[in-house]
């Protein structure tokens, strides 16, 4: 039995249990001749237990026979940081000019534990520094030890 060859990858951020044929999902899948309804059903079933509307980075692998598989990653660090800081959006200014909120180092460590599978490190301290850097870029002050 021969192995399927990969035709391409599609990277999308899709809300949990919220895949619909509307843009951006429909056009992205339609260009690669993927069954849009089947993907939406499979994705919504796979993410049904999660909180609705959570943004989920998803990598869809399209094969030469127009079949597909997908991998759902953890939500972006910015989603968790905004949730911990109780803000709706980050700062539009540069790092030190306009801080819009605070987040603790312990919160950054908790986020790092959740995100470590998607980060380019397996060291929890390095992952925490990555999350702290994301917080600073969003205009969040990291407080704590």
Curated annotation (Swiss-Prot):
SMART domains: RL11. Coiled coil: none annotated. CDD domains: Ribosomal_L11. One or more lysine residues are methylated. One of its GO terms (biological process) is translation. It comes from Rickettsia typhi (strain ATCC VR-144 / Wilmington). One of its GO terms (cellular component) is cytosolic large ribosomal subunit. Belongs to the universal ribosomal protein uL11 family. This is Large ribosomal subunit protein uL11. Keywords: Methylation, Ribonucleoprotein, Ribosomal protein, RNA-binding, rRNA-binding. It comes from the Bacteria. HAMAP family: Ribosomal_uL11. Part of the ribosomal stalk of the 50S ribosomal subunit. Interacts with L10 and the large rRNA to form the base of the stalk. L10 forms an elongated spine to which L12 dimers bind in a sequential fashion forming a multimeric L10(L12)X complex. One of its GO terms (molecular function) is structural constituent of ribosome. Forms part of the ribosomal stalk which helps the ribosome interact with GTP-bound translation factors. Transmembrane segments: none annotated. Pfam families: Ribosomal_L11, Ribosomal_L11_N.
